[in-house]
A protein has these predicted regions:
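Short, glycine/charge-rich beta-strand/loop segments that flank catalytic centers
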Residues: 64-80
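C-terminal, well-structured catalytic/ligand-binding subdomain of enzymes
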Residues: 1-63, 85, 89-246
Length: 246
């Protein structure tokens, strides 16, 4: 419906609370509490239109982790945009996540859409807007800045912490809610500033397909059938795998 992720939490409250407990088991209570605090502070000054929705979810769940898990982007995944078909594999190191997946039906200003998601998660990672487009979000490579992976990761986190642009998962949800068609979605995902690099895969109902490779304020678009994991298809941008080769 039109009530968003907060309403989904009300409909599936036990599943949402189970997600928070899975986060605690995977990351430990102290780590989750610290990242939740930092995430809450960042979202408070972020331009995301969904920050208040996350606040409502956190208040309803009354558990540590809602803010952190909503801006967590530490996953690996593979997507293929082949004509009118979007293929998606999720190989995330988050035990138990698959059992909590739901398909939620939403209504945006541009029409209805289906969100493959989890109760308590506000953004969109994989979705379908019938008659308009389907799309998925993958994590981009980590930029090469030094020869030491932890140092590069820390530099990127500090850069993200200073950004006011919306997270990529929030932009993808906004596209599903407001983009009129495939071309409109591509333009939106190509041009809207985001907080960190990302990879968007899209297909359209008339055989269209595209991969949108994004940095914070720049983009490279590949039209036609492509497969992308967590590496750049272009040869202009450098990057390193994030623990899993792709």
């Amino acid at each position: 419906g039109t009530l968003g992720a907060a309403h989904l939490v009300e409909m599936a409250l036990p599943h949402a609370k189970r997600m928070m407990e899975m986060g605690r088991r995977n990351y430990s209570g102290p780590v989750l509490a610290l990242t939740d605090w930092r995430s809450r502070r960042w979202l408070a000054r972020n331009e995301s239109p969904y920050a208040a929705e996350i606040d409502r979810i956190a208040k309803r769940l009354d558990l540590t982790g809602a803010h952190a898990l909503n801006v967590s982007f530490e996953w690996a995944c593979t997507s293929a945009a082949v004509g009118p078909v979007l293929l998606r594999a999720l190989d995330w190191p988050f035990d138990g996540l698959g059992r909590a997946v739901v398909v939620a039906r939403h209504q945006g200003s541009a029409g209805p859409w289906l969100n493959v998601t989890w109760p308590g998660f506000v953004g969109a990672l994989t979705g379908l807007a019938p008659g308009r487009f389907a799309a998925a979000l993958n994590q981009a490579p980590l930029r090469y800045r030094t020869r030491v992976f932890p140092v590069d990761w820390l530099i990127e986190r500090l850069k993200v912490s200073r950004s006011r642009a919306m997270p990529p998962a929030h932009l993808l949800r906004f596209a599903f809610e407001t983009a009129r068609n495939f071309d409109h979605a591509v333009a939106m995902l190509r041009d809207t500033p985001i907080a960190l690099p990302a990879l968007f895969s899209l297909t359209g109902p008339d055989g269209q397909a595209a991969i949108v490779e994004r940095q914070e304020r720049s983009a490279i678009v590949h039209k036609g059938s492509e497969v992308v994991a967590n590496h750049w298809l272009n040869t202009e941008w450098n990057g390193r795998p994030r623990g899993i080769d792709s």
